[in-house]
């Protein structure tokens, strides 16, 4: 092979390599363009799907807006697998058919349903209507009070455990004995003796839904509003069972009925009658317990206090000396006290004081120490606090300079 031929071959080879690298570069560029187009296509497909979803939603809303309104009724009872007796106000009661998407097992008495306007067919089950004021009565967070925070009420704690805590945690014991579970308990006694505190402790230990309502909240100015709130209160308690309904100041609606021409008194009596009806209506095995508290048991209606509605009445007397000492120990547990403080002597200085007043003595003693810029509480602070809270004559002899130093 001559030199000329070799040079021609090498020249052709280099030309071929140049073409190859050129086309490879072009192919890579086109692949990048194709990848970018695919990415744009996927993005456009996602946008299309999102727009289609919005279109479907708008069409459904438009269809709902174009539909005729439905009647709202309340189920009385199911008649058979395809028929239900429904009460519609004010028309009356109707036996209606079920829509194909409604299961007869989901249709229970007293539930709210929607009926078609033209055929009265039951086509939707509605949620129960609850007044916002009633829903606010349910305490979302379980109270942090415990039995250890209640001093001097060992007998009362034992009795309320038997009535409220034991049926919720161990209902089989009542079934074994063949006795009915207690429905409710009444806590009565002077103000500040620990009725509300013990109710909160029960809710903490039973881990139940705690519904707290004051009797004055059920007194409404419009006729029938208070009765409706009582009904919705028990409906909410059944939905969130096991639950405890704590009614404080029950004497505001549960006082003895008298003949009066006042419309306000009549409305309060209607509210109490609805409460009596609800106490008779719900079963004790439904894990709904009622705790009532009052400091005026003498004015309560006898119908409210009879067994079967209120099965146990627990008295909260003013604490004796030992009980006051226990309360002082509980509330001074976290206080920074000096050595040698005689809490028994402090308890002896408060004859007839309530538990709230004993707690107030601890708070006032801390305020006296704070007033003098001290980080500890002394015996003298407690004695001055007792004199102030109990309003004794010794308060007049205290040094003004000592008080306002």
UniProtKB/Swiss-Prot annotation:
Gene3D superfamilies hit by this protein? 1.10.8.60, Nucleic acid-binding proteins, P-loop containing nucleotide triphosphate hydrolases
Which molecular function term from Gene Ontology is one that the record holds?
ATP binding
**What SMART domains does the entry give?**
AAA (SM00382)
Q: Which residues form a coiled coil?
A: none
Subunit record text? Component of the 19S proteasome regulatory particle complex. The 26S proteasome consists of a 20S proteasome core and two 19S regulatory subunits. Interacts with Rpn6. Interacts with imd and Usp2 isoform A.
Query: What family does the entry list?
Result: Belongs to the AAA ATPase family.
- Protein name, per record: 26S proteasome regulatory subunit 8
> What's the source species for this entry?
Drosophila melanogaster (Fruit fly)
């Amino acid at each position: 092979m001559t030199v000329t031929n070799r040079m021609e071959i090498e020249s052709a080879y280099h030309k071929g390599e140049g073409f190859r690298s050129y086309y490879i570069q072009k192919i890579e560029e086109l692949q990048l363009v194709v990848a970018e187009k695919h990415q744009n296509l996927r993005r456009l497909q996602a946008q299309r799907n999102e727009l289609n979803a919005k279109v479907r939603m708008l069409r459904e809303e438009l269809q709902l807006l174009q539909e005729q309104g439905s009647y709202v009724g309340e189920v009385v009872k199911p008649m058979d697998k395809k028929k239900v007796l429904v009460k519609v106000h004010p028309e009356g009661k109707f036996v209606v058919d079920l829509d194909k998407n409604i299961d007869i097992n989901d249709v229970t008495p007293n539930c709210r349903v929607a009926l078609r306007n033209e055929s009265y067919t039951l086509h939707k089950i509605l949620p129960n209507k609850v007044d916002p004021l009633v829903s606010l009565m349910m305490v979302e967070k379980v109270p942090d009070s415990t039995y250890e925070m209640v001093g001097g009420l060992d007998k009362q704690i034992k009795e309320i455990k038997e009535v409220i805590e034991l049926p919720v945690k161990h209902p089989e014991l009542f079934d074994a004995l063949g006795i009915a579970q207690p429905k409710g308990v009444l806590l009565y006694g002077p103000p500040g003796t620990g009725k509300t505190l013990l109710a909160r402790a029960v809710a903490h230990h039973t881990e139940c839904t705690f519904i707290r309502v004051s009797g004055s909240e059920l007194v409404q100015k419009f006729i029938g509003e208070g009765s409706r709130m009582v009904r919705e209160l028990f409906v909410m308690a059944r939905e969130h069972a096991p639950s405890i309904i704590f009614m404080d100041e029950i004497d505001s609606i549960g006082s003895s009925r008298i003949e009066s021409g006042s419309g306000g008194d009549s409305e309060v009596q209607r509210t109490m009658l609805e409460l009596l009806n609800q106490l008779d209506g719900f079963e004790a095995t439904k894990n709904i317990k009622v705790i009532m508290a009052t400091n005026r048991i003498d004015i309560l209606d006898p119908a409210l206090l009879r067994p079967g509605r209120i099965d146990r009445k627990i008295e909260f007397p003013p604490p004796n000396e030992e009980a006051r000492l226990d309360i002082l120990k509980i509330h001074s547990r976290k206080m920074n006290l000096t050595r040698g403080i005689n809490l028994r002597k402090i308890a002896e200085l408060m004859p007839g004081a309530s538990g709230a007043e004993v707690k107030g003595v601890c708070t006032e003693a801390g305020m006296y120490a704070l007033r003098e810029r001290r980080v500890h509480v002394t015996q003298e602070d407690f004695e001055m606090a007792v004199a102030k809270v109990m309003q004794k004559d010794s308060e007049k002899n205290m040094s003004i300079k000592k008080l306002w130093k």
